[in-house]
Amino acid sequence: VATIGTVLHAGEESFTIKKGKIRGVESYGMLCSEIEIGVGTDNSGIILLDADSITPGTPAASHYGVSSDYVLEVDITPNRVDATSHYGVARDLAAYLTQQTGAEVRAQLPELTASPEAGSCPLPVSVEVPSALCPRFQGLVIRGLKVGESPKWLRQALERIGLKPINVVVDVTNFVLHEYGQPLHAYDLSKVGAGLRVKLAEEQKMTLLDKSEGQLSGQDLVIASADGTPLCVAGVMGGLDSGTTEQTTEIFLEAANFNASSVRKTARRLGLNTDSSFRFERGLDPERTTWALLRAASLILELCPGSSIDGGLFDHYPEPSEPYAVTLDLEYMHRLIGQEIPESDVARILASLEIEVTERQGKLWSLAVPRYRVDVTRPSDVVEEILRIYGYNRIELSGYIHANLSPKGAV
């Protein structure tokens, strides 16, 4: 029972329990469903408890083992795709804390336990489009699965960010997407056939995971079976017929990088805006796929005892990406800002942002900017990043105002 004064949340809406009357009888609370108290997704009716397993008066949080938690809503600007994950936000916060405290602070990634064998992947995969459309395509096969409900910690982690748990495989891919920012997809091997093809679609219809029917065009990138049947709209949404279910015993787990413009056009034409397309449309770093793939595989192996990776890792990566090369002139930076920032601070800020100083020639610094920072490709972008971490509040305001005035009477 939610008593008077309790604040309940249903999706993005919240309401406070107040004293009221129902059919002339005073009400001092409300019986709740799972979704209303945040312990599940069932909203069909009130929760029925076993009277023999619980003592009246026990707090619901204690009975369900719900610990205190906080959900932070972060408003990410469109150019900061690197921050569209928990790790991305933590990495940026670490750079700020390094500058503020003077001690090196680093965002840490979990240890990976999955280790594919040396050799080839047992599932044939062919990439039939230019590297510009699909810069990288990786995947591995996992067999011996018993797909069921995810453990409580994983279900709660997804529910707290507004996602509905599906099954352990799908939940892991969604978890890693939000943890690391790299979309993943799992195909039921029994529905794939003799292999996978990354290709442009034919003029055909496809039933998607949300049960909607999309009309594909020859400009849409898809992952198809060996006979050409589309299984997934690349970077947007998987197909209903190839997804994992409780009957799935083996999967092909995919982590890929798709062209931002291609994904954007396809998603818009199909009227879809998914967590996957949201990230691909803004440009992802192909170097990030391996960690995400092995992280998801590690979790699946941990949560599905008896499962194992079969064979090696498939990796189509014909043109490996390089860091952005930027030359920073410190004198230019000081003129642009209107104040000198100590070189020691500049070096520390760049290091905290994982921007490598590859060479110094006096005031000219050669930089290697990580590919995941798609918004930092020019000297002015680097200056903006340095100033953002250094602190705008530390820049003194000039007492002078510079303006160009037109002569009297000029138009």
For each predicted feature, which ranges?
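RNA/tRNA-interacting regions in translation and RNA-turnover enzymes
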Residues: 1-411
